[in-house]
Amino acid sequence: MNQKYSVTVPELGITFSTGSIAQLANGAVNVQVGETNVFVTACVAQTTKPGQDWFPLTVDYREKYAAAGRFPGGYFKREGRPSEKEILTSRLCDRPCRPLFPEGFLNEVQIIGQLFSADLVNESDISMVNGASAALAISDIPWNGPIAAVRVAEIEGKFVANPTIDQMFASSLDLIYVGNEKDMLMIEGSADQIPEERFIEALAFGHESIQPILKAIKELVAQCGKPKGTFPLVGATPEARTIIERVVPTERLIEAIFGKEKAVRANAVKLLKEEAKAALTAELGEGKFTDVDLNVVFEDLQYKAYRKTVLERGVRADGRGQKDIRPLQAQVGVLPRVHGSAMFQRGDTQNIALTTLGPTKDAQDLDALTGGVKSKSFLLHYNFPPFSVGETGRFTGPGRREIGHGALAERSLVPVLPPEDVFPYSIRVVSEIMASNGSTSMASICGGCLSLMDAGVPIIAPVAGISCGLMTQNASDGSIEKWVTITDILGEEDHFGDMDFKLAGTSKGITGFQLDLKINGLPFEIAKTAIMQARDARMEILKVMLGSLPAPRADLSKYAPRIQTIQIDPEKIGLLIGPGGKTIRRITETTGAQIDIAEDDSGKVFVYSNNAEAMNRAIQEIDSLCGGGGPGGSKGPAIEVGKIYTGRVTGVKEFGCFVECTPGNEGLCHVSELADFRVRRTEDVVKMGDSITVKCIGIDERSGKVRLSRKAAMKELEAQKQSSEAAPAQ
């Protein structure tokens, strides 16, 4: 897209251009990476609405099907409601831009980003953030930017800035870093249990990587930037502020909000607000002040009161210290019939999580215009009904906030899920928020993890989440001179504080994270403190969680579908499917079992049913049609309990190894069954391709999983040897 002005970031292959397209917008910039183009505009309303006391910033990102050379699906053949990816990208852009608008600036601002071309190599979300920054920076809209964004991957132990979509499949880290020249402004992403120290190194790498982008945006501003406009700032009148501060001094407000339950605190503040309104009416007269006067001053007073108790007294509104966690409760199996369920509660925040297992065909298809993953077999849906905060309201589909919170919890749990070849199920977790007073997304992670364990999903390690907040005091030059990080923030501490830093992970490292700020940047020193503080809190929460269920259940719920894997000749896949799917449909309809065929043409067939007879009939039909087959996917004889086998190690995992005992038929030898001493790492005993001797110690009746033991086999063989040596010679 050729335009009048352009700058390039050669280190990252990014080009910003402007000046010829959408010239009536306050700011308009095209961002090109490879052949992926995102066009971003920024516009501002010239007036505010009467009585408005909040900042209406709207960010909308849309992907055009034409960008990928495709027609939209459906009857109308045009783009419709925003997809989940579009919503998440919009939120990704909104969060770092919002805190940089001037206090009291309440004119509506709208940022629109459109994907105009997609090369299926480079993702578009980072371009959206950088484009919004550039559009705001060159516009006349008052804004304390620019900012810049970069994605950081870790591939084979090395950090990579702005990796391609294909490179991300090999990465153990997905970090989106947004910052300015000095500080970080927003981060989000996921990781494969990255240690905190390594995570901090990744943040430093991200900060270094954005500097060329910031330099380029400033060059663009120098070429064509508009002078910043003058807009009236909304605030309380001096007369109203003086009256309210006299009637409700900070100490009275501290007394109202200190050391009480949420409902009591809210009622006490409400009474003080009514008292202040009565004083305004008495001294200024009816109609001589507005709700804006009252609301703005009361927000300021509460802002001062909450941080005064923390910064000066070291005690928070509910009486806790800086690092104290609210009382924790965890229960599993709270509901019958469901495949897995759990209740997790932290203080007033409470969630119920439900897990459902299904066949792989229940995976969600993704219409990925920019490329990447085409489906996902793990879903986490977050619901926030109005009763959770004691209010009435709409009870319909999920909003942007619910989609965002669900995505955070989902990506925090994905790194510990078993691979599909170990656990070939689609999994859906639903987090129902029953009561809310801060950090409901972190409660969703804790409850969701417990419900997975209750459902018998063999997760690699349990995951817990915690949120850290921040209270700051600025010097006269605007720099932070005093600060305190606080663990497990309340809803009020989130609202009146400066930071919401959500961190989730296992005992080994971080799996999910999200940082949101209300200040103009977070120094690295504070970020490091919060990260380590969150680690300590996470360990405490994990203890409580594991107290309710120490490990995933060995067996699935009796209501969950059973699964058997059958190996057929790949050349007979077409025979099993039949013309137009006729054969596989007939088997499904006559037996009642569900049948999935692996998409990799390996010949693996998955048979699902919660009825043993239906499953066996389906397996027999497939076996008679295609030959081979049998429980466990065997072409050889089925594994039998009590027998000893010498087989080949086909998979090495953190929790044990898989051994093929007969052709196409394998089982799991748990790490605890590898030797008669404690094995720290599976690789210390066996490696991929090794030949080992194991004994079948059990087969789960519902799931068909085969349990093997090297320890039991060695013990039995040693006993046989001693017995033969002790026998008298004939």
Curated annotation (Swiss-Prot):
Keywords tagged on the record:
Cytoplasm, Magnesium, Metal-binding, Nucleotidyltransferase, RNA-binding, Transferase
- Any one Pfam family here would be PNPase
* Keyword Lipid biosynthesis applies: no
Q: What residues bind Mg(2+), as annotated?
A: D494, D500
User: In UniProt terms, what function does this protein have?
Assistant: Involved in mRNA degradation. Catalyzes the phosphorolysis of single-stranded polyribonucleotides processively in the 3'- to 5'-direction.
- Protein family membership: Belongs to the polyribonucleotide nucleotidyltransferase family.
Q: What is this protein called?
A: Polyribonucleotide nucleotidyltransferase
Gene of origin? pnp
